[in-house]
Every structure is written in C-alpha cells, then in structure tokens.
C-alpha cells in the first residue's frame, strides 16, 4: 500500500472531529497499524505544547501574526516528526486540520491576508500538502449554534469569536475549494450525521480501495 495523506477541514461546528473519528472506526480494521491519526495544532509533544498556548482562552492579548506564526511552527514540527515518517512507512495519515485552516482562520478570519499566510505555510511545509482534503461545510449560524449547544464546557479561544469572523473563515474555505478542486472535496455537513459519513466514505473509498 502506498502512503496517503488526507486532511479533514471545516469551520467550527461542522462536526469535523466527530466525522474523523467515525472514519477511523470505519477503516481501522482494514488498515490496522497502517493508519496514523493525528491533529493540528498537535501530533507530537512540541506541537501539543504550542497548541495549549494558542487555544488558551486566557490569551486574549495574542497578536494575530503571533498566532499565525505559532500555527506554522507547530505545523512544521508536526510534518517532520509525525506526518512524513508515517508516509515513508506507507501509512494512511488522517489529519485533523492542516494548512487550509491557517489560510481560513488567520488569513481571512484574522484579516492578515490569505496569500501572506499561504506563503508563510509554504515555507513551513516546503510545499507539502495533503493528497485529498475533506472539507465539511456548514453555514456559520448553524455552526455557532452547534458549538453553544454541544460544547459549552469545552469552548476554546477561537470558538469565542463573533459571527462575522466565522463567516470570513467559511468564505475562505469555499474559495480554497474553488482554487484547488482536485484536492478539496466539499461535503454538506448540515445533513444528518449518517448522510455526512456516507458521503465522506464514498470519497475515501476511491482513494483507499
């Protein structure tokens, strides 16, 4: 089996992590120890330490560019320590977020500029991108409603942003999907969960079968 790098993306409230876990359960028996599941920011001790700083809701004074640079630093370490070694072993890598998240959240959400953040991350990753990206799309209003309903005890600093921030994030994701149609597959995440899982499995089966 050849290695495959697959990322899962989506605005807050899209159910991304829930869907990713369902995909792990679906493919675990088939792939066994050839499946590597990781997340961003995180995936190794250094990147997890950076994650704690980024998402701490007490860090309200964090500058936008500081945030973007921290994400890029965590991503670099994640790539060289976790993702690339797994791919060299011909593993399938399921990654909860990658470069597209920074472009959407810091580039558009924080208004730093999507091109600037893209170039920053090209430097960090030396151009490495997922083979396929599953983008779970949900209207911002619905996403925020889900956050407040289901995640009241586990809300991080980015979840606390206002509606216009999340609308900019979603718009940037959709722009990326238009720019990279061969890599990014848009899934309607406003559907029932079983329907979302069915659509994602249909995409992944084309890669993994």
Swiss-Prot record:
- Reaction catalysed? dTMP + ATP = dTDP + ADP
Q: Specify the enzyme's EC class, one word.
A: transferase
Alphabetically, which GO biological process terms does the record hold? dTDP biosynthetic process; dTTP biosynthetic process; dUDP biosynthetic process
Q: Which Gene3D superfamilies match?
A: P-loop containing nucleotide triphosphate hydrolases
* Molecular function as annotated in GO: ATP binding; dTMP kinase activity
Mind naming one GO cellular-component term on file for this protein? Answer: cytosol
Question: EC?
Answer: 2.7.4.9
Which Pfam families does the protein's record reference?
Thymidylate_kin (PF02223)
Q: Is the Oxidoreductase keyword given for this protein?
A: no
Keyword Oxidoreductase (UniProt): no
Q: Where does ATP bind?
A: 10-17
Keyword terms of this UniProt record: ATP-binding, Kinase, Nucleotide biosynthesis, Nucleotide-binding, Transferase
State the family named in the UniProt similarity comment for this chain.
Answer: Belongs to the thymidylate kinase family.
The job of this chain, per UniProt, is described as: Phosphorylation of dTMP to form dTDP in both de novo and salvage pathways of dTTP synthesis.
The entry's protein name is Thymidylate kinase
Q: Which organism is it from?
A: Pediococcus pentosaceus (strain ATCC 25745 / CCUG 21536 / LMG 10740 / 183-1w)
């Amino acid at each position: 089996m050849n290695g495959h790098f697959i990322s899962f993306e989506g605005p807050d409230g899209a159910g991304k992590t829930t869907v990713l876990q369902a995909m792990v359960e679906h493919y675990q028996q088939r792939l066994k120890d050839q499946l590597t599941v990781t997340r961003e920011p995180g995936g190794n001790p250094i990147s997890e330490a950076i994650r704690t700083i980024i998402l701490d809701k007490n860090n309200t004074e964090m500058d936008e560019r500081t945030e973007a640079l921290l994400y890029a630093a965590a991503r670099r370490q994640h790539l060289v320590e976790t993702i690339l070694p797994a791919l060299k072993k011909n593993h399938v890598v399921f990654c909860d977020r990658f470069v597209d998240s920074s472009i959407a959240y810091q580039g558009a959400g924080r208004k730093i500029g999507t091109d600037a953040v893209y170039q920053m991350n090209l430097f960090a990753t030396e151009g490495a991108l997922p083979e396929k990206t599953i983008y779970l799309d949900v209207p911002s209003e619905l996403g925020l409603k889900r956050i407040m309903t289901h995640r009241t005890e586990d809300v991080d600093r980015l979840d606390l942003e206002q509606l216009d921030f999340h609308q900019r994030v979603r718009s940037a994701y959709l722009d990326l999907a238009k720019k990279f149609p061969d890599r990014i597959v848009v899934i309607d995440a406003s559907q029932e969960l079983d329907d979302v899982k069915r659509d994602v499995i249909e995409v992944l089966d084309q890669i993994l079968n």
